[in-house]
C-alpha cells in the first residue's frame, strides 16, 4: 500500500499534506467545543445570564462556519487526490497489461485482470480518500479527548481506562478473524467475474446448446461461494459497532452516576460533567471509526498487493531491446527445409528445434519443430483439432516464447526485436475476428493511424471487402458496433484482414481466417493476396481446409504437436498419411501412394 502511495502520490503531494493538516485544525475545534459548552452552562445557563449564552453561542457558530470551510478544503483535496491516483493507477495497469506476454496474460487470467483494474483500484481509491479525511482526525480526536477528560477530573478519567481496553479487545478479536478472509473474498470475486464473462461472451453458444440452466447453476455456485465468505466477513465486521456502542453507553452511564455524586459533593460543575460525557462519546466513537478504517485499509492492502503484482511483473519481452544487425542464420543441421529456402541467405522465418508447453499442461503443445521459410513465400499449416496450429503461429509471431529452441524472423531472434518494430513487420489475423466500437476507418487505422484513404481502400480491395463497404451510406465512416456485431462473420473476417494489410507488413499470418468465407470469395482473396498485395509479402496460412493451403509453396502438417509432413500439396498427398486422411475427409482427390514412409517417421 505504501509503495503505491509513493509511486502514484507524488503529483498530489501538497494535497496529501494540506488535506490532513486541515483535519488537525478541525480536531482542535472539536476538542474546544465541549469546553465552550461547559462554560456556557456554568457561566450562562446556571447563572441565568442570556448575554453570556449568546456570546458563547456566537463563538460556537463561528467555529462551526470555520469547520465547514476547513471540511470543504479537505474534501476537495481528498477527492482530487483519490480520483487522480485511481486514474493514474488504471492507466498504468492497462499500459502494463498491454505489454505482458501472452503467457503472462494466461497466468493472470482476463477476469482477474479486469477485477484488479476496476474493483481493486476502487478499494485503493477509497482508502486514499479516507486516509486524507479520517486517518488524522479520529486518532488525534481520541487521544485529545482522553487528555481533556483527564485534565477535567482524573478520577472520572479512570472510566476511560476501563472502557478503552474493552473496545480494543473487541477490535483486535474481530480483526484477527476477518483480515485473513479479505483475500479469499477477492479470489471468489475473480471467479464470479470469470463465470459472468464466459457466459456473456458465449451467450450464442449457450443458447444454441440450451445450456442456460447449467450456466445459471455455475453462476449461482460462484456467487454463493463469494457470498458465504463475504457474509462471514460482514458478520464479523458488524460486531464492531454494536459492541463498541455497548461499551460506550455503559461508560456514559458510569460517568453520569459518578458525575452526579461529584457535583453533589462540589467537586465538579454541571458543565464539566456535560463536557466529560462529550469527550467520552468522542473518544469511543473515534475508536469505532478507527476500527472501520482498519477494515477498509486491510481490504485496500490486499487490493494494493494484487495491483502491485501486475505492476511489478516485468514483460518477458523487452520492449526497448535493440534489434541486432541483419545476419544470415543457419538452420539446424538436418532440419526440414521448405523448397526454395536455401536460395535466400536470410529466410523470413527460421525455426530450430522449437518446443512449447502451456503452463499447467502435462504434455507439450509443440515438439521439436524445425523449418525455414524464404521471404515472399507462402506457408500453409494444416492439421486436426488440437494439433498445435495456432500455437505454432503464435510462436512465429512472437506472441509466446518457446520453451526450447529458437525462432528467427528475417534473420534475427524474435525476442531480440523491438516490440514496436516486430508488430509493424508482422500482422496477425486471429481466429476470432475482433472489431472495436467506432467506424470502419478507425478500425482499419490501428496499424497506421495516418494511413491515407487510398491505402485503406487498397487494403479493402485486397481483402475483398471494398464492395460491401462502398455500399454502406457512410463508407469508411460507417459505424462499427462493439465486437462488430452489425456485420456478418464473413464481413468481420475480411475487415480484420484489411486491417492487417494496412501499413504494409512484411509477414502476414492468417489463423483460420477464411472459415466464414464462401468458396468464391476465399479463392478471390487468396488470388489477391498472392498477386495484389505489396511485395514481397510472406504469408503463413493456418487452416483446416485443404483448399486454403493447397496452392502454398509449402504445407506444414501437424499432428499432436509434431511436424509430420512438409512439402507441396502433391508431395504430401503422395507421402504423408495424415495429410492424405485430411484430404480424403474433405473429398479432395489424392494421387496413389508413392511411398510407404509416413510423415511421422520423417519428422522423427
Cite the ranges covered by each PLM segment.
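Membrane-integrated ABC transporters
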Residues: 1-33, 37, 45-60, 74-78, ...
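An intracellular "coupling" helix at the cytosolic face of ABC transporter transmembrane type-1 domains
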Residues: 10-13, 99-103, 119-128, 132, ...
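Transmembrane helices of ABC transporter permease
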Residues: 11, 15-28, 130-185, 257-268
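Juxtamembrane helix-loop junctions of ABC transporter transmembrane domains
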Residues: 21-22, 26-42, 63-110, 114, ...
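Helix-loop-helix
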Residues: 49-52, 148-162, 232-314
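Conserved catalytic Walker-motif region of ABC-type ATPase nucleotide-binding domains
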Residues: 97, 219, 307, 351-353
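ABC-type nucleotide-binding domain
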Residues: 325-604
